Amino acid sequence: LGDVYKRQGTEFRGVNLWVLICATMVASLGLNVNSAAVIIGAMCISPIMGPIMGIGFSLGINDFDLLKKSVRNFVLMFVVAISTSTLYFFISPLGNASSELLARTTPTTYDVLIAFFGGMAGIVAQSRQDRNSTVIPGVAIATALMPPLCTAGFGLATGQYRFFFGAFYLFFINTVFIALSTYIFTRFLKLSLIHISEPTRLQLI
């Protein structure tokens, strides 16, 4: 399980970078033309779930190095996705907000529950020896990370900041509760903790 999250948390270059850019473009196009099917496809191929679950996992086992790499790559993915979607919507001739865009601007309590239990499903699936390859795409669809990011890009590109803040808040909620559920279940599994000799570093974790 540790090796899985080390790969997910540390690898953001080459293929993953281009996959993220393509996923962002697909999601932006789907939001622009109001196509739920296209948006779902973008959520399935986006690699942004890896660093988020890597953050929760690294906190659960006190792996400070993995935490730093996961946070760094999460921030990089966030910046790349926001920049790509903002650029797309800036040059897109379709400037009207579709119902799919509007749906990502008003987070509810249900979004919190979906993110929490979606993240829980992800860590449970990864902890199995026969890791079910259908679970992680399902989690990505349920928790919907890419659409809020692209909606935030739409808000920036069009100067409609209520779209940006509403969508960013939804993305933030999803991120926090996916990481939280991963952390809780990692602790529940009682995986081996990384020994930390420096008290200050332990406090940071």
List the model feature ranges, each with a label:
Residues 7, 11, 31, 126, ...:
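Generic secondary-structure signature for well-ordered alpha-helical cores
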